[in-house]
Each structure stands twice: as structure tokens, then as C-alpha cells.
């Protein structure tokens, strides 16, 4: 399925789900709420020029889709992967609106990244790319505007490089990026948090909806990234009983 089809499918599924609510509230249609939700408030595209270890200038594309800030600053990760393009980021940003709103925290939805492939690159090359990326991105983000995080290929190392460049340019030490190391403002157990959340959410759903628990059950986990790995660790521990 192409990324445009994925975006349209996600929009269609959301609209089908909320259709009964919309039918009871014609004022939503009059205000164009649905049309506004599916159109990003802002799409930022920029060139990222950086120098590799051979002294050659490389050029990548950078993106930040600031989808919706109705309930708070844009919030969503940065992804570095060769498959990244505007369509991918738009699809992920739309999903981020809904995920963030479900937390009940005042966070809007956004997503960003680049088609840069860190695989096979040295630490110095990754650092120079991150610095060049943030040099362009920094004018569009801020603790009250847009707070990026990590995603695929953007972990603690990359967040550190990005945050360092942000501080250098903006001359401020603020909560503009999540996923930082504990040494400079990061949160304890952030790496495990999403995977653990899957366990606790499923555990609570079983209890509330089925009056049941994990005891005696086989759990199937899809994937092998940070979310899946830490979900498996908690599922197989005594804490999941």
C-alpha cells in the first residue's frame, strides 16, 4: 500500500468512527472541523547540507509537519530513514494528533524527519548531519510551539547532538526536545516507557472489559524495536502477573 493510500485509509477509518458523533452535532460540520483536522496547519521542508568524513558535501531533505495545535504545542518524533518523504511524515503526523489527544495532556500533533540514512555513517558524520538539520529546524520549534522527540534512527545520541546545536544557536536551555540523556534533563525510564505502557494498557483492558488477567495466557508481540522489546521484558516478568 502506497503512503498516500495509508493516509487516506487512516482518515477514512477515523471519519467512519466519529460519524455518529458528527451527525448529532451539525455545528461541527458548519465549522469545518473534519476538513481542518486532515489538513496540516504548516508543512516545513528544507535542505540539509552537511560534510562527510571524506570532505564531500552531502545534501538531504528535512521535514516537519505541524499538523494540529488545537490543544497544545505540536508534539511528535523525528525519523531519519531513506524512505522518509513528505507523504510519510504527513501520514504519521495525522496519527500523532489522535495518539497525543488520548493521553489527555495538552499536546498537539506533529512529525518530522529526513531521508538521511545513518547506517554505516561514523559518529562524526551523524553529529554533523544532526547539527545541520537542527540549524534549519530550530527556527520552527520551541518549548511553547513544537517539541520534537526521537523515532526510528533517532535515539539518545542523536537527540543529544540536536539539543546541543539548538542551545548553541538559540542560546537557551529549554525543554524543546524530549528523549535527552539523564545528564542534561532527560526522564528516567523513558526508553522502557512505551513498551511498559502497552503492557499496562492491555492489562487494564483485560481487567475492565473481560474481568481477566495475563495469568495462563500466551502473548503475541509484533516487532523487535524498543516498544516490542520492553513489552516482552515486562510481559515475562512478575510485574505482569
What residue ranges belong to the model's regions?
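Conserved small/polar residues in nucleotide/adenosyl-binding loops
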Residues: 1-5, 235-241
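N-terminal ligand-binding/catalytic initiation module
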Residues: 4-188, 192, 201
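A generic "cationic amphipathic patch" detector
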Residues: 68, 102, 211, 232, ...
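Glycine-rich phosphate/diphosphate-binding loop of Rossmann-like nucleotide-binding domains
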Residues: 192, 196-237
Amino acid at each position: 500500500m502506497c503512503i498516500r493510500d495509508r493516509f487516506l485509509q487512516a482518515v477514512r477509518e477515523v471519519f467512519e468512527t466519529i460519524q455518529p458523533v458528527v451527525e448529532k452535532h451539525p455545528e461541527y460540520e458548519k465549522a469545518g472541523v473534519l476538513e481542518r483536522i486532515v489538513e496540516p496547519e504548516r508543512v516545513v521542508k528544507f535542505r540539509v547540507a552537511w560534510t562527510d568524513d571524506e570532505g564531500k558535501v552531502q545534501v538531504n531533505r528535512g521535514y516537519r509537519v505541524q499538523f494540529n495545535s488545537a490543544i497544545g504545542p505540536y508534539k511528535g518524533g523525528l525519523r531519519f530513514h531513506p524512505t522518509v518523504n513528505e507523504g510519510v511524515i504527513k501520514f504519521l503526523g495525522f496519527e500523532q494528533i489522535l495518539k497525543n489527544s488520548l493521553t489527555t495532556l495538552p499536546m498537539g500533533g506533529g512529525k518530522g524527519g529526513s531521508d538521511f540514512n545513518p547506517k554505516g555513517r561514523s559518529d562524526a558524520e551523524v553529529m554533523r548531519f544532526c547539527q545541520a538539520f537542527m540549524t534549519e529546524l530550530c527556527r520552527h520549534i520551541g518549548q511553547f510551539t513544537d517539541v520534537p522527540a526521537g523515532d526510528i534512527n533517532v535515539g539518545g545520541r542523536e537527540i543529544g547532538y540536536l539539543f546541543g546545536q539548538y542551545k548553541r544557536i538559540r542560546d537557551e536551555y529549554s525543554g524543546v526536545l524530549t528523549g535527552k540523556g539523564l545528564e542534561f534533563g532527560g526522564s528516567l525510564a523513558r526508553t522502557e516507557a512505551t513498551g511498559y505502557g502497552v503492557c499496562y494498557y492491555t492489562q487494564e483492558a483485560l481487567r475492565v472489559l473481560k474481568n481477566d488477567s495475563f495469568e495462563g495466557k500466551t502473548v503475541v508481540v509484533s516487532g523487535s524495536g524498543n516498544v516490542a522489546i520492553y513489552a516482552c521484558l515486562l510481559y515475562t516478568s512478575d510485574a505482569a502477573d
